[in-house]
Amino acid sequence: MSLIRVNRFGPRGGGRKTLKVKKKAAVRQEWDNTVNDLTVHRATPEDLVRRHEMHKSKNRALVHWELQEKALKRKWKKQKPETSSLEKRKLSIMKEILSDQYLTQDVLEKSDHLMAAAKGLFADVPRKRTGFPNVTRAPDSSQSHTGINQDPVTQSILNESIIEPQALNEVDDAGEQSTAHSQSEDSENELPNSLSQHSNRSTERFLHQLKEENSELINQLWTDIQQKIATQSQRTPPGSPSSELSAEDQKAALNATDAVKRIQAGPQPEEAAEPVDFSSSYLGQVLNTRKQKPLLAKVKRKQDMHAASKQKTNMLSSSTASADRPSSTGSSLDVLKHVIHEVEHEMEEYERCTGREVTGLQGGQGLTGFTLSLVSSLCRLVRYLKESEIQLRKEVETRQQLEQMLGDHRELIDALTAEILSLREENSTMQARLQQYMVTTDEQLISLTHAIKNCPVINNSRQESQAPERAAMGRRLVDNVEGPVISSNGSMPLMFRGEEVVEFPQEELPVKLSQGPTPTENLNLANNFPTHIFEPAVMLTPPRQKSNSEFSPLQDVLRRTVQTRPAPRIPPTVEVIEKEQNWEKKALPIDPDIQNSSEENRLFTQRWRVSHMGEDLENKGQPAFVSLSQPPCSSLPSTQQPRNPVLSEEPTVLGDGQQLRTSEALVQRKDIMARIAELTLQNSAIKAHLNNITSSGGEQGDGLREPRKQGSASEVSTNFPAVQSLTPSSMEERIAELNRQSMEARSKLLQLIEQQKLVGLNLSSSPVSPVESPLRAWAEEGKRTIEVSVPGMEASESSKCNTVSPVSGNSSRRSSGAISNSCSPLNATSGSGKFTPVNPRTKTEKKNEEGWFALSAHIP
């Protein structure tokens, strides 16, 4: 075992590698644009787009289309593999159908080539024509013009009946024209479509065969053509220019030049070639049926041209012939005279047509006469031309003026039409305004008529006539009762009487606190009062109650009526009417009829304290007091309709439904209603007096209460029909019923007076009007509030002193006031204008009452 010594200082582990330190990458610095900014040379987006478009392939659309076609073909092959076989079948069928045509085309092409190559078939080359030299010679040279071979080619004449003459070489002018037409037709027919050319050639060959078979028909046509040519030659003038011309006369002619000779000699070959032309044209018609119409047109044109040329040559020949012979006959002068006569005749016709003077023929002999007539005719023509030119100019000027006038008239018409349209619009607007004005005036007239009908001044005379009757009734009532005097004229408020009507200011207007008994009475009262008194009533809250069982059915009905039905506008009410004397003192001078005794004022106040609805609907032991509001009124203008619909329209139906159609019936009805209102007021006054008497005797024993209760019950029973019988059978029955009720009330009043005498009650201790003057309250500014106590059913039978009268609406206050020898007055507070009750009863007695009923109104 050998040990190898290893050098410890040598490198151990040859696999060790030394770690290489990586160099950090140098930070790339930003472009330094301080010296040169290369962003200027950067391409813009537009340049990039343009370069991109430049480098695009030009065949891109074509390649794209080819790729699409290839894709479609692949798709069709995949979807319909039978299409290729179907197309092959179609091609084979088409080849079978058109094979014969293709074969005929090939045969015809070969035959055409052979015919073009064969030059000696008819001893001349096809399309060979004879030339006509165009040689110009001197005007005075006597050398004849170049001779022309007049003889046609013999082979063409021989083959004229076999081959169409348009394809042959002809010598005469007609032949030249026909060959020119054939060349033009050939050039037109030389189209890229070779099928039509070959078919035409084949048809020509077929017609050639038919011509050989139908020789008889051709002979007949030839004879017809010859006859036509003969008739046409007979129509031409017999004198031919060639026969008339001679060598001797050529020198004596006026215009004996070679030009005239050339003109005369020109038509000769045309006339010579004319029969050949006709024969060739008719043969062409027979052989070429397809080209009959154009050939006929060409023949007609040629005939017209020949006829015109013949006429010209005849005229020239005649003029030259007549001029060339001034010999013994003098034919030229005669011709000139004849021409001048014709000119003169035409001039005369022209003068007659234009309305000019016709000048006679100027006779003359010889050339001088001819020249004179010629010059005169020329002068006349020039003069007529000038006149016509002047007239034409005038017509043009007048036409321009008329056009200008027409334009002016059109402008005027346009302006007039615009003005008419504007006037129509204004007229329509004015009509609409007039219609609206008529409607408004009609409404104002209707409102004015209603206001005049409802004006209280109309009823003044009627009320003045009824005043003595009311005074007499008051006196009879005083005599029967033997008590305080009730004067309907004296104690009645001023606004209730028809003598004078005063408009109260807003701070002095009365407050309405009562409900009218019936609608008819309300209507009568409303007709007697001014319209400014009436205003819509304010809906009030019902009075407080302890329980519904305490109210009778009649009071329940009254309560619902007060809640749901607005109060009619009727005269001033309970507590305020007592101070009407003070109002009259302030507004009017004192009237002696108004100044009555305090007893009359007291009695009238007590009468108006009674609420009309309450006195008819209250029960025996359950009083009901209705308090309604009346805001301050302002007088309405005469042109405005009243707000109350009952007052704005005159009622035309009575209680029994009878209609009033005349003014007399309306006047009678108003009188009856006024009488009913008067009786109702008297009845209420009697009832008020009766209530005062019964309330004053409330302190006595129970034995005295029983007859009063019985009387009250009977009175209620008598009062209810007045409320329930709202529509009696007639007005007379209602008046009688009211009279009966008043008599019953009077009798009851007498009985009660006798009972009071027996008891020993002093009548002078009856309560005076407790209401103070309301002037202080109404003079205050701001809001006024009137609070009236509404008594109800007593809570218990213990408070016997508060027994309520069955008729009076505020009897609870008077009964309580009878104990303390004073009724509960209303203190008019000066600060707030608020009426508060001053009652000597204790708070416990006040709690027993039904509640409070507040009425408020604002004075602007």
Curated annotation (Swiss-Prot):
GO cellular component assignments: centriole; centrosome; ciliary basal body; cytoplasm; intracellular membrane-bounded organelle; plasma membrane; spindle
Matches recorded under Pfam families: SPICE
Biased composition (Polar residues): 139-150, 190-200, 230-245
Record's compositionally biased regions (Low complexity): 317-329, 627-642, 804-824
Residues found modified as Phosphoserine: 240, 648, 765-766, 769, 824
Record's function text: Regulator required for centriole duplication, for proper bipolar spindle formation and chromosome congression in mitosis.
Protein name listed in UniProt: Spindle and centriole-associated protein 1
Native species: Mus musculus (Mouse)
